[in-house]
Every structure is written in C-alpha cells, then in structure tokens.
Amino acid sequence: MTTIFALCTPWGRSGVAVIRISGEDAAKAFVHFGINSSIKPRTATFTPLYDKDGEVIDEAIVVYFVAPNSFTGEDVVEFHTHGSFAVIKMILAELGKIFVPAGPGEFSLRAFLNNKVDLTRAEAIVDLINSETEMQAKQAIRQMSGVLEKLYQNWRQQLIDILSNIEAYIDFPEEVNSSAIANIDYLLNNLQKSLESHLNDDRRGERLRQGIYVTILGEPNSGKSTLFNHLAKRDIAIVSEYAGTTRDPLEAHIDVAGYPIIIIDTAGIRESTDPVEQEGIKRAKLKAENADFKIVMLPYEKRDIFNREIMSLIDDKSICILSKADNITDQKLIPVFDFSFIPISVYCNIGIENLLNLIKQKVEKDFQFCNTDPFITSERQRKHIQNTLNIIKSVDLSLPMEIVSEDLRLSVRELGKVVGVISDDDILDNVFGKFCIGK
C-alpha cells in the first residue's frame, strides 16, 4: 500500500499541530526533512525540520512507531509541530513530494484492515470525535473498549459451534437422533432470546449518540419560547405578546448533566382557523409524538382552568410546569387536575433548577448504562443483528440438515458483518466515509 500523510489536528492557530504519516516508507520522512539525530521507536525526539535548501521550517517533536505496534499496524511517523498555518502548509507541501495525501478515515481503515480494530471500535472512534457531551463520550469509550465486539464475537462463535455439530451430523447421519436435534433447538432458542433482548433496547444507544429530544408544548403565550431561549442560552425563538408567533418547530442543543438534549420549541396549541397556524399546531403535535420526553406548560394564572387539549398531552413521558409563577415563594410541586406541576419563572429564575433536575432524572432512568449488555449504537449494527435474528427464527430443524446448515452459515456471515469479519466495499465506505481526514 502507498504511504499516506495528513494533518490530524484541526486547521487553525494552536500551540501544537500533529501531522501523521503511515506506510512502509514512512521513515523516508526523516531523510527528506534532514533529520540527522537517531530516532528511536516510541520515543519523543526533539529535532529541527529542514527544507531542501537547508532552511529550518520548524522545531518539532518526532515520534516513530514501527509496525505492527502502531495505530494503523504500519510504520507510523508523527510530527508534533507548532500550530501555524505557514508551518503546516510548508510541511504538508514537502510531504506531498514523496507521499500520498490520506483520504477521510484512511488511517482508521488501515487499522481495520490490519486487524487493529473491528468495525464497532472504528464506529466508536467516530462517535468519540463527534461527541459533545460527557455521556456521548462515555458511550463511545465503552464501545472502543471492545464490549460490543466481544458480545457479537461470542454470539458468532456460538453459531459456529452449532454449525459444526450440524456439519458433523451431515457427515455421520447415523448420529442424528431426537436428543441431538433437541440440543440444537435449545441452543438456537437461547441465542434467539439473547438477540431479541439486545434489539429490544428502545434504540437507547442511537438516541444517546444523536441526541435526546425534549419538546416544549403548551397553549399560545404560555412562555414556551421564553423558556426555550433561556435553556438554549441565546435568543433563537421570537418572544412576543401576540399569540401564534411561533409557527415552525425550533431546535437547540443543550447539555443536561452530560446528556445531549435537543429541546424543541413549538407552536401554541389551540383551536385556530388560520391554515398556517393549523399547520404549526399539527407539527407541534407530531413533534410531541416523536419526542423522547415532553415539557407540558400551563400559565400559573390559568392553573384552575381545565384545558382539555393541553391536559390530553400529558403522559408518563411528560414533565408538567406552571409558567410565569413570578411571585411564588414555595417551589414545591403544585397539584393541578390530578397532575403535579413544577412552578417556574424564567424572569425571576424560579424553578429552573428543579426542571433541569427532573429532565436529568427522566433521562438517567431511560439511558443509564447497563453493565451486562451494551447498547447498539448504529443503524448498521442493528440491521445486521436483526437479519441474524430473522435467519435464526426461520431455521426449521425438521428439514434436511444440509438446508439447516446453509441457513446457519448465512447467520454466521451476517453477524460477521457487524464486526467486519465479513465485509464488503459498501460497508467499509459507509463506516470510514464518516471520518475526517487525518483519522
């Protein structure tokens, strides 16, 4: 394979920039930059970098990793230089004379091809790079540790063991009896239950990776946009005394106790003859249906007026709040028509911490990490696991063992696609195409 290079840190002024080279000719960079000092593997060496005229480009820390003891499994050289636009441009220009620029995710792709990471760990690297909150990072790091790979490899090995028994029965049909068939059926049923339990996770891993949706609902002028802007810590929604100002749902990303929350401001819900407002209300209700959680608002001064349409939105996913409670002194929950409401006032900063704590409690209850069974974190993983389950469920042990064997061989192949034991170009393009250049 060609020797590749790329800037691994973002473009821009910084204290340090890291430029990585990977491939069998990586050490040629030492000669090209006039590095005379002995570069010991896995040791940080301070040295000047020279251009072809003998002029110093920069003073750098050079680290050399000899294959296979590197991230990619190949010889790797890293230049830790000053994060100057000029310095970076000069070094990359020099490297372009002897090496090939890396494509997006090409370093990680080589790590995969050299068996340094499986596909689930490669996906975790992308997720860690893209993580914006503590819990997103923790989920990615947990996956990078290999918990998903170990789980899927264990299931795959179970299928291989069952398949081996069936292949033996094909070669020695006299060994096939009711006890042997019952044992295979027992093993397949246990594996089926494990796969079903794993898939029945309410998509927690994907939702945590992408963001947890919390929709704000209420009648017009109940303070939805004011609360939305306060939580977002910037003015996104227009706040007006005129009802019906908000039409299209607005989104903002916030961090609540390390969880990625996407809050959504929506149109006020009421009876309306305005077709544009009706469409906004329709979209608000649709956002409510698809949300992970809902904040249902009633103005404090209207707490004794039963609003059937607003009350009908309350369910076990809801946090109920009484807005505009500016003069309240007791922040305890207030009963309103059999529901408990939190009094808040954005203007007086009353009850906001209580609201955030309730959001935290609800999110932690649904998204806390399980120590025994890790979450699926991508649609790609889910698809192959579901395909594996479908194949196992279709196995008919009353059919000839040759047919059963072929079905199980397909299931082994499908599970192998999750970790990359079996892969094709489309799968690799899908996974590594999400990386930035330099990773």
From Swiss-Prot:
Gene3D superfamilies: P-loop containing nucleotide triphosphate hydrolases, Probable tRNA modification gtpase trme, domain 1, tRNA modification GTPase MnmE domain 2. Its main location: cytoplasm. InterPro entries: G_TrmE, GTP-bd, GTP-bd_TrmE_N, GTPase_MnmE, MnmE_dom2, MnmE_helical, P-loop_NTPase, Small_GTP-bd. (6S)-5-formyl-5,6,7,8-tetrahydrofolate binds at R20, E78, K116, K439. It is found in: Cytoplasm. Binds 1 potassium ion per subunit. Its cofactor is K(+). Residues 211-364 form the TrmE-type G domain. SUPFAM superfamilies: P-loop containing nucleoside triphosphate hydrolases (SSF52540), TrmE connector domain (SSF116878). Its EC number is 3.6.-.-. Mg(2+) binds at S225, T246. GTP binds at residues 221-226, 240-246, 265-268. One of its GO terms (molecular function) is metal ion binding. Keywords: Cytoplasm, GTP-binding, Hydrolase, Magnesium, Metal-binding, Nucleotide-binding, Potassium, tRNA processing. One of its GO terms (cellular component) is cytoplasm. GO terms for biological process: tRNA methylation; tRNA wobble uridine modification. Signal peptide: none annotated. PANTHER family: TRNA MODIFICATION GTPASE GTPBP3, TRNA MODIFICATION GTPASE GTPBP3, MITOCHONDRIAL. Belongs to the TRAFAC class TrmE-Era-EngA-EngB-Septin-like GTPase superfamily. TrmE GTPase family. Exhibits a very high intrinsic GTPase hydrolysis rate. Involved in the addition of a carboxymethylaminomethyl (cmnm) group at the wobble position (U34) of certain tRNAs, forming tRNA-cmnm(5)s(2)U34. Homodimer. Heterotetramer of two MnmE and two MnmG subunits. This is tRNA modification GTPase MnmE. The gene is mnmE.
